[in-house]
Amino acid sequence: MQLEVHKRLEEKMTKTLGVLKDDFNSIRAGKANPSMLDRITVDYYGSITPLKQVASVSAPEPRLLIIQPYDPSVINGIEKALMMSDLGLNPSNDGKIIRLNIPQLTEERRKELTKVVKRVAEEGRVALRNGRRDANEQLKKMEKDSELTEDDLKQAQEEVQKITDKFNKQVDEMLVKKELEILEV
């Protein structure tokens, strides 16, 4: 039963890392990357739809994204959504496709983005700690219900801490990698 707790904890923490990775990918680092538009939603015939469902996004050059709508009538909606986003990009619409030139990041913007990345990483760590707390509570309940001995509880809690440390280390590695990517000129 205690292995079940550890297994659920690992699954929960793996999902947390996946979310963190997606969050990091949506933060632009100076290079054109189609995943930076993953969070953009477009008003498509009255319903809010993710950009990738109404258009294809490609990066033919390091500082250029091309957005080609599947339905040309939605191009103005896409342009409006891009202008309203927090990416700070100015779309160029030629009626068929939208070009997004990715400007070089200023030193000030780079520092701002590293703060954002650190905050996102801390949110990930908080989620990991919450998972650890939940697992430890389950283990204590199992001990209280006489499903675990005191020694087994201690051993299981140590295993929970090892799992948490392993995932925290991965968060730290992801953070360092993203910071280097942002600060790279």
UniProtKB/Swiss-Prot annotation:
What does the organism's lineage look like at the top? Bacteria, Bacillati, Bacillota, Clostridia, Peptostreptococcales
Any GO CC annotation of this UniProt entry: cytoplasm
The protein's predominant localisation is: cytoplasm
Q: Which UniProt keywords apply?
A: Cytoplasm, Protein biosynthesis
Q: Relate the protein's function as given in its record.
A: Responsible for the release of ribosomes from messenger RNA at the termination of protein biosynthesis. May increase the efficiency of translation by recycling ribosomes from one round of translation to another.
The similarity annotation says: Belongs to the RRF family.
User: Its Gene Ontology biological processes?
Assistant: translational termination
Give the species: Alkaliphilus metalliredigens (strain QYMF)
The record's annotation in InterPro entries points to: Ribosome_recyc_fac (IPR002661), Ribosome_recyc_fac_dom (IPR023584), RRF_sf (IPR036191)
* Gene Ontology molecular-function annotations: ribosomal large subunit binding
Q: Where is this region: Disordered?
A: 132-152
The record's subcellular location field reads: Cytoplasm
Protein's UniProt name? Ribosome-recycling factor
